[in-house]
Amino acid sequence: KKKTKIIGLTGGQGTGKSTISNILKIILKEAYGLETVIFSIDDFYKTLNERKIMSKKISNLFLTRGAPGTHDTKMLYRCIKNLKKKKFKKFMIPKFDKSIDDRSSKNMWLKIKKKPNIVIFEGWCVGVTAQKKKDLINPINELEKVKDNKKIWRQMVNLEIKKKYKKIFNL
C-alpha cells in the first residue's frame, strides 16, 4: 500500500480553507477514487480547564484559544502518526465546540475507520515557523505591549512553535 499523503493548508480565518478542503475531497474521490480525511488544528485546542491552568501558571493570554501553545500537541502528533501508520487501526479525531469554548464529547468526534490516501490538515497556523530571538524584542501590537510587557506569552508561543509544532509539521 502507498503511504498516506498529508496536505497542510493554511490561511486566515474565513478565507475558505474548509470549503476548498471539502471541494478537494470530492474531486479526489470522484476523479481518482482516493479516500480523504479532513481535520482542523482548531479541533485540537486544549480543554478550557487546561487553558485556565496555563493562564494561571504562565500567562493569562493562554486562556484565549488560538495561538500556538493552546493546542494539545501530543494528541495532534499521535493523530497524524496514526493516520500514517502502515498497520492502520481505527481511532477518533477530536472535535472542538467553539460555542462552549471546549472540546466536544467523544460521541461527536470524527471516527476514522480505514486508512486514508490523503489527509488535509488545515488551520491558520499550520506550517508556521518560529521567530528569531531578535524579532521578539519589540511588541508587535497593543495587546503585547499592554498584556505581555515582560514577553512571557510571546516567548512561550515561539518556544512551542520551535519545539512541538515543528515536530508535527515535519511529519
Where do the protein language model's features map onto the residues?
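Extreme N-terminal, non-catalytic leader segments
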Residues: 1-8, 12
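Conserved lysine of the Walker
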Residues: 17
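Hydrophobic positions on the alpha1 helix immediately C-terminal to the Walker A/P-loop
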Residues: 20, 24
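Glycine-rich, phosphate-binding/catalytic loops in enzymes
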Residues: 26-27, 55-57, 135-139
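Post-Walker A helix-loop "phosphate-sensing" segment adjacent to the P-loop in P-loop NTPases
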Residues: 26-37
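Conserved nucleotide-sensing/catalytic segment adjacent to the nucleotide-binding pocket
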Residues: 37-40, 44-101
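ATP-dependent NMP and nucleoside kinases share a basic, alpha-helical "lid"
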Residues: 103-171
